[in-house]
Amino acid sequence: MKYKYWLACMAQMAENIGTGKVEKLFRFAGSAGVLYDMSEKEFMQIPGITEADVKSVLTYKKAWNLEEAWENLKRSGLYLVTREDENYPKRLLYINKPPYGIFYK
């Protein structure tokens, strides 16, 4: 789940990366964990992802302490639901560029 958290946050905070590109990245990798572990060379093979996008993803990944952020989220009492989860609001799947993840309390 922590990799889904990373992906949901990246969709909102990483430069040049939004919901549409997160969708492309996720479809290519098949899971947030696989995506997190991908190399620069692997990212460059994703159709529709530019060199600037790859740089943004890798910069965000390097600058963000995932373990610390994940522990902070768990302590905060907030929860995350992503598109792959059963309890993701089904109606959101029908809008243009639905959010990858939603935080709730």
Label each residue range with its predicted role:
Residues 1-105:
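Short, positively charged patches
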